[in-house]
Amino acid sequence: MLQNGNEGMSTIPGFSQIQFEGFCRFINQGLTEEFHKFQKIEDRDQEIEFQLFVETYQLVEPLITERDAVYESLTYSSELYVPAVLIWKTGRNMQEQTVFIGNIPIMNSFGTSIVNGIYRIVINQIVQSPGIYYRSELEHNGVSVYTSTIISDWGGRSELEIDRKARIWARVSRKQKISILVLSSAMGSNIREILDNVCYPEIFLSFPNDKEKKKIGSKENAILEFYQQFACVGGDPVFSESLCKELQKKFFQQRCELGKIGRQNLNRRLNLDIPQNNTFLLPRDLLAAVDHLIGMKLGMGTLDDMSHLKNKRIRSVADLLQDQFGLALVRLENTVRGTICGAIRHKLIPTPQNLVTSTSLTTTYESFFGLHPLSQVLDRTNPLTQIVHGRKWSYLGPGGLTGRTASFRIRDIHPSHYGRICPIDTSEGINVGLMGSLAIHVKVGYWGSIESPFYGLSERSKEAQMVYLSPNRDEYYMVAAGNSLALNRDIQEQQVVPARYRQEFLTIAWEEIHLRSIFPFQYFSIGASLIPFIEHNDANRALMSSNMQRQAVPLSRSEKCIVGTGLEGQTALDSGVSVIAECKGKIIYTDTQKIFLSSNGDTLSIPLVMYQRSNKNTCMNQKTQVQRGKYIKKGQILAGGAATAGGELALGKNVLVAYMPWEGYNFEDAVLISERLVYKDIYTSFHIRKYEIQTHVTSQGPERITKEIPHLEARLLRNLDRNGIVMLGSWIETGDILVGKLTPQTASESSYAPEDRLLRAILGIQVSTSKETSLRLPIGGRGRVIDVRWIHRRGVSNSNPERIRVYISQKREIKVGDKVAGRHGNKGIISKILSRQDMPYLQDGTPVDMVFNPLGVPSRMNVGQIFECSLGLAGDLLKKHYRIGPFDERYEQEASRKLVFSELYEASKKTKNPWVFEPEYPGKSRIFDGRTGDLFEQPVLIGKSYILKLIHQVDDKIHGRSSGHYALVTQQPLRGRAKQGGQRVGEMEVWALEGFGVAHILQEMLTYKSDHIRARQEVLGAMIIGATVPNPESAPESFRLLVRELRSLSLELNHFLVSEKNFQMDRKEA
């Protein structure tokens, strides 16, 4: 029934496999395909010929390591060499050399590329697959109009449609449409060939009139008519060779090149047998498409679902890199042709190495990785973030959709997404449904199809054989779900099972099943697969949890979860943050920086990552997990990375939580925590910030790094060494100088001292002064200096400045304002840190660590946190760890609840604590108020939950403005923390202040602290001398701006003062 080409896969495929396979396909096949498109280059007189021998190209191993590339801000790339030959046809001489084409960035062990010292990743793009698609639309009068859309390999679209008069038109753009007969004739078919190759010749003969028959009488007339309508030119154009070339370039190459994928889809849809290497639209294709369209009009055939994954394909890293390589070769071809012409003009003898430059390829890839929307900076907040980023897909980008034009139908979940695209994990906001994650078992096929594995059941023995199926194949089979997902194949299957067939969900007999799903997590992404009891959560909360797990900060002391799903180990392994033994051997030495391993008589040095900064300022560190003298096996973990524990992903901590109100401090999702989490460093994390300064060569001379900076206090320079750079290990406070720098500048004539003017007048010496441009530590950046890097420029070019980078580590304990979250979308802000003795405590005297709002559970419908909380308590008491797959109700009803209650009952018996499981209110317990020692009135749900500390921390968000910059036009303070901006007092805030009657505060907000220029200056002077702050008398700048705006509209705004005594009007201008 099914061909099995994927036997033997017993584990989940590597999570970074898609990136690796894509890059290998680019190196092995993509380069060769683009090289074969490189044509011979000749001069105008055809005397010199240049060509490349593309069969023997060579990629050299990178000259630097990944660590050096990151450290020195270089690109981790490989040099590409190709043999080239230059032939002089007149003298029959030939010169062959190996030329350097350029550098190609190489993928590293994380599945990413290092460009200019930055980890970058290319995400997958889902685009409409080239081919032909049929659809119908209702007009305003209720008549159906059938159209077919031909999508080229470059994204160009051409439409065929039948109007109400049964006339067939080809629409090459939104405005122009042309008769199908004219288009067919312009493509080379005459009227007799058209009528002989269609199924409905009477329809073709019915609509052309005498004028149209004249247009299609010859190919030249058809081309002229088509060109006149397509290019929208007036008059009567004359047929010429240049006109044909222009039409070929503008229309046929852009809109009629199908590519290999488009040719395959067109043959399959129209039942054609045209060879695969014929990648352009032929007249035969056009006539077959019209026949099919007429059949649709007559009620035959099926319409296409544009949202189905069989009509889409993935542009992976292989396709994107191959497109850029082809673009670079086109630029190289133009450069070589221009160089040959220049050499002949100047009567020089060129060589292949002189003709070829590496600029085209190098700059093309640097531009792609730096500017392309699908090339993104790798998010390295934690290991999960790294690995999920490489499995993202997007409808956005060049050739795709935009967030504002994408319809709801495109964003919605489609039945063909089953097992291929995660229905949970997607972006929030304007890009919802346009970006998401691939399911964990997905494989990208050769043609860009998203393939998912199934167990194919043979007709005789019903034995399972694993097969990968594309979306256009599995809809023809009955795919079982539900109870058939049991991992134990020996379980007797029921007679009737739920199944999926042709995008419909049915209930059929087991004997009719063709395929069955292979794993309970098959249809989820990595983020969603790490949520225990996800089947008990609302999908919106599961989406939030998938996104928030990627925002978790690695803690100083990692702890793996008590309740998990079983994928934590592979996630940590595939992320690459842990060090894995590549061979067996004996550990002979370990420290914090390296491990020495003796294997087969050789000693291997394995370096470890120490306090490396991620682009989210989190700390990536590796800790040794093996001891000296121990023997290890291949694949054993030598050192654990950040946010890992025991080889498993460990993003948070197991803490004792209670769901109860407490004095309003957990109102609206606020969280009350114990001070134990602070002084025991349970949620302490390290953050590393980078500060950089560059030295340039100015017109007045080079900038200098020095400690000798005049007119500065000595305390600001106390941490600098003799070179003017901060010393390692120094404790730095806000405002301290990290790097001392002086920039030379020429002073004005009036600022010279008398002796300087004398030297200048007598000796002509130009006296220069220096401006202090040192690197200072900004507000909120206090910490310990852990690394200083002085990166010198390579070569003598002044465009490459020297850079000095200072890395400062901060130790952040959890505090009020930090954001915490569980794995079920239950998030909140720390509202108060309570002393340990005031926290509610259990019947055995254990104080609670966190108090959550119980009202956050029923309305959000994320009941999975209740199961995790209770099972976590049982696991903590029994010293167990649970790994539970989703949808355990496939075994029996209420399986989750039975498991939790049985474990709580066992924990109650084993620990002899009856309060752990009380039949009257299972899962709940009577706890005491820490302040009074009294019992709370109602039993409270308590347990151990796995809570994460997120990257949204109050230290990065808190901000206060004392003075700062003002906008030039409105003279109001700027907005934003980065600009030392202020907080806007809007209309509703003014109402609030008016409601309290605080007139003086309101006046300050609208004048001194806003845009009253004169009042600001007077307030500053009064504060310095200690005088009374004067009241503002004139209008603020915003009012003056309004007056100027009205004047620009020829409207004059004045006000008049009327005296009560003599009723005279004194006019004063605003």
Swiss-Prot record:
Alphabetical list of InterPro entries matching this protein: DNA-dir_RNA_pol_bsu_ext_1_sf, DNA-dir_RNA_pol_su2, DNA-dir_RNAP_su2_dom, DNA-dir_RNAP_su2_hyb_sf, RNA_pol_bsu_bac, RNA_pol_bsu_CS, RNA_pol_Rpb2_2, RNA_pol_Rpb2_2_sf
Location of this chain's protein in the cell: Plastid, Chloroplast
Major localisation: plastid
Catalytic activity: RNA(n) + a ribonucleoside 5'-triphosphate = RNA(n+1) + diphosphate
GO molecular function terms noted in the UniProt entry: DNA binding; DNA-directed RNA polymerase activity; ribonucleoside binding
Family matches, as CDD domains: RNA_pol_B_RPB2
Database matches in SUPFAM superfamilies: beta and beta-prime subunits of DNA dependent RNA-polymerase (SSF64484)
GO biological process, one term: DNA-templated transcription
Gene Ontology cellular component list: chloroplast; DNA-directed RNA polymerase complex; mitochondrion
This enzyme's EC code(s): 2.7.7.6
Keyword field: Chloroplast, DNA-directed RNA polymerase, Nucleotidyltransferase, Plastid, Transcription, Transferase
One Pfam family of this chain: RNA_pol_Rpb2_3
Subunit structure: In plastids the minimal PEP RNA polymerase catalytic core is composed of four subunits: alpha, beta, beta', and beta''. When a (nuclear-encoded) sigma factor is associated with the core the holoenzyme is formed, which can initiate transcription.
PANTHER family reported for this sequence: DNA-DIRECTED RNA POLYMERASE I SUBUNIT 2
Record's function text: DNA-dependent RNA polymerase catalyzes the transcription of DNA into RNA using the four ribonucleoside triphosphates as substrates.
Family: Belongs to the RNA polymerase beta chain family.
Name of the protein this chain belongs to: DNA-directed RNA polymerase subunit beta
Natural source organism: Phalaenopsis aphrodite subsp. formosana (Moth orchid)
Gene: rpoB
